[in-house]
Amino acid sequence: MFSQVPRTPAAGCYYLNPLTPESQEMYLRFDQTARRSPYRMSRILARHHLVTKIQQEIEAKEACDWLRAAGFPQYAQLYEDSQFPINIAAVKKDHDFLERDLVEPLCRRLNTLNKCASMRLDVNFQRKKGDDSDEEDLCISNKWTFQRTSRRWSRVDDLHTLFPVADRNGSPGGPRMRNTASSESVLTDLSEPEVCSIHSESSGGSDSRSQSGHHSADSTHALEATLVSSSLPQSTREGLNQSFHPKNEKPTRTRAKSFLKRMDTLRVKGALGRHKGPGRTGGLVISRPVLQQEPESFKTMQCVQIPNGDLQTSPPAACRKGLPCSSKSSGESSPLENSSTVSTPCMKERKCHHEANKRGGMYLEDLDVLAGTALPDTSDQNHMHGFHSQENLVVHIPKDHKPGTFPKALSIESLSPTDNSNGVNWRTGSISLGRQQGPGMREPRLMSSCHRASRVSIYDNVPSSHLYASTGDLLDLEKDGLLPQLDDILQHVNGIQEVVDDWSKNILPELQSHSTLAGDPGLSPFPSPNQVTLDFEGNSVSEGRTTPSDVERDRTSLNESEATGVRERRDSGVGASLTRPNRRLRWSSFQLSHQPQPSPATPHISSQTAAQLNLLQRFSLLRLTAIMEKYSMSNKHGWTWSVPKFMKRIKAPDYRDKAVFGVPLIVHVQRTGQPLPQSIQQALRYLRSNCLDQVGLFRKSGVKSRIHALRQMNENFPDNVSYEDQSAYDVADMVKQFFRDLPEPLFTNKLSETFLHIYQYVPKEQRLQAVQAAILLLADENREALQTLLCFLHDVVNLVDENQMTPMNLAVCLAPSLFHLNLLKKESSPKVIQKKYATGKPDQKDLNENLAAAQGLAHMITECNRLFEVPHEMVAQSRDSYLEAEIHVPSLEDLGAQLAESGATFHTYLEHLVQGLQKEAKEKFKGWVTCSSPDNTDLAFKKVGDGHPLKLWKASVEVEAPPSVVLNRVLRERHLWDEDFVQWKVVERLDKQTEIYQYVLNSMVPHPSRDFLVLRTWKTDLPKGMCTLVSLSVEYEEAQLMGGVRAVVMDSQYLIEPCGSGKSRLTHICRIDLKGHSPEWYSKGFGHLCAAEVTRIRNSFQPLVAEGPETKI
């Protein structure tokens, strides 16, 4: 880096070899008299480069993690295989079913990986292949397929379409620079996402202040390099191209270094060459500055920049947008090409427009807001060919125009007119006054642009009389030509006042909040400004949906009785109805006001299969990322869905000594199958039944001693808690403490900040959509507990006249406990805590978070019936993938057709399953992965390669009963060991040992119960005294739905083997989709539920412990 070349024989100074501008600036910061030695300076620069490289590697890892989580695992695989950079345009084509706002987050991550690949970062991600690492098996694009044997993604068609032409023809490791054969800008050859990446401020979760500058500098450097290449003569460009692909292939870093040095040399020569004199020709021309933060509306309005020189030297507008440029000259332009459109200019992002206007002129006629997006590509080319020279254009201003005011009308006359027809743009009000149409020319379309040879711009908010007074001296109205067209405009254009109001809302967004409070925003025929800027808001889930009122549902529930201590159940039809102590809460014990009431056309989260929910979570992450990166300013550059860096992976603590408080929700799921313990559900039931009329519920504090006694009762006797005669305020405070004592907030550590940002930055019109996406990303146990709590709080609000607790009052009281706002975070150092709370006053950030939490929780309480619905537009965008994720339940005829044997029936299929189970037992269940489980049970799982994300689980336990007795207990006496078993019946007996059986399992309120319809058969005459029970779901038209949601039993097998001394070994192999749960929930909790099931069967045979003293016999 440094060459020791003394300036003079006596001076020991050193020359600097050419450094990068960043390195030179860093070096020159030091004082000349006290500069570091060259060796020390090289160490500083090397350390800086190392830090930069590490930061880029972190960005690449976060981008790959996001790609896998959002349903794009194939690109993460390509990056790990060193197959980047890839063509962004091809990626966009692969995902053409996604909206533009949803593609932008993907393009940002891919541009980050392209940049990291150009730096040749050696990033090898060691991903841990855990039990729940099946995320890579889902891709939202149908252009890719997953090879399960090699566990790799492969493209359905040609893979080479993803890579740039330069990378395909040249060396695989060459720099990804493009040169063009003309003198146009390089943006002509770049796709739109690639151009947008130059202006992007986010790169996969990097820090905004430290990385955006580097990214812009690197992108500008690359642009300048290609601009130089495109403006050089052909011979010079060929010489420059030889540095890209020399005959003797050199390493990539060497070619990149030589290219950068050559670029620095050319830049210096070009800068010197411009000042050598006016006679110098053929000098190097560097492109003028490129906007690095071009606003989106600047592109939408299709503005034309007017440079100081000849217009022919600047790239046309369409070229800058990535559209193909026509080679026609101004004399060859067709009538449609000479036309243009006009509309009222948009005032959005005024500051950015002002900065852009400083760089070049802008014609008012080229501002197209409403019609620009609806016109065909030919209208975009009109702006390219409309103005070829400024000398041929004359702009007329009305005589009564006052200086300093905006002109009411403008007229542009061409000194070289052509024969074109006049026309009116019905959408924008632009009037074209040209010569009469010739006989051989066709009539122009209404939506096409008008002739530019003689054109007037008219603004919609100018009265017609005033307009004629201002333009009468400019235009020859011909009295019979224009006025009828103006009448037609007034007849055809409807709702001009609404358009003006819509523009006003766009200019002043605060006006919309007042109009929303005054009336229903859905009545407006025009979308709101936020709906215009975000495409997918146009299909809001709030449109066209009605739900039964709470009053009607409450009226229905008033006649129902609350039975305490007795379990209600309808007659099964198989045996006498049984009652026993109530340890699980039942649907019939609650009002109907808190039950979910989705409309028939609206899918609910609880009815989704695991594969469907897995797919919807990908779309939710993609949609939420698009919304938050657009509006969330504080987290715009660091958006990542990984666990925060301060949370280190530590050993999971042991919760065996805790029953209720301080236990994670997933542990409750593993114990009981429900995220909330039974004692907390009993507390909510008690408050709903007896205390909703208490004034200030959850606001008034209880007595600490009584609350402590309630906590001890819950910990010591969690299954036998009674709240009779307890104070409502004590029970309510205990419920608050339960959520406050959770190891992580109810909204999880990952997404708590996201929920707060939604209510801080996202516009009100899009908050429901953003919250729906965030709720889909919550862990299943957190989402179910949240739904139970919100439905309960909604019931509290329904009696606001008695308890005076509005949604905002409840939110203020409960938000700190649900978000853990006021708790000192463990990641904060003592110095930070001491500095933050030294004055005793919360900082502004804490105040903003508390306000956002209160507003957000109040909104969730009000919209609790809609938060857990699946948006229609998300289902529509998933296309066939959503339908393919549905589980096809076979009929009896389909079961026989699945076998290759001719004439096979469902009996043959069931016999095949029984033989397969016997074979597995004979081979000692080889290939299963064992995992830890409690209560002396053996638990293992095995992945099934049939495309469904659920695993096959196996739980084994020894039972003190012979096989035939255990089989009867499983087959006919489920009510003795399953507390959720509420209803059952035999639909049809097919033979002595085969039947179609239907039963219902209860769920936590307000979630729907699960209905099972299975075909099952059992065998008792197997070798060695074994018994089997095999069942699976079937489609049977005569069986009506008895529960809330029809679950799917893909495989359920019981194997009972004798162990001697009257004992048996019970093995249960199970694979069930309960609906409403993600694959992660099954990986974390379903295996424990299988182990708990066989444990309950074992415990049902244990003899009762006799009370009293022993007697001697």
UniProtKB/Swiss-Prot annotation:
Residues recorded as bearing N-acetylmethionine in the entry: 1
Compositional bias ranges of the Polar residues kind: 179-188, 230-245, 421-435, 529-549
Annotated site residue numbers, Arginine finger: 699
Keyword field contains Chloroplast: no
Keywords annotated in UniProt: Acetylation, Cell cycle, Cytoplasm, GTPase activation, Lipid droplet, Membrane, Mitochondrion, Phosphoprotein
GO-annotated molecular function: GTPase activator activity; lipid binding
Region of interest called Disordered, as start-end residue ranges on this chain: 164-218, 230-256, 308-343, 421-443, 514-578
SAM domain ranges (all copies): 55-122
Topology versus the membrane: Peripheral membrane protein
Annotated signal peptide: none
Coiled-coil annotated residue ranges, if any: none
Gene3D superfamilies: 1.10.287.2070, 3.30.530.20, 6.10.250.1870, Rho GTPase activation protein
Subunit relationships: Homodimer. Interacts with TAX1BP1.
Biological role: May function as a GTPase-activating protein.
Full protein name: StAR-related lipid transfer protein 13
Species annotation: Mus musculus (Mouse)
Lineage: Eukaryota, Metazoa, Chordata, Craniata, Vertebrata
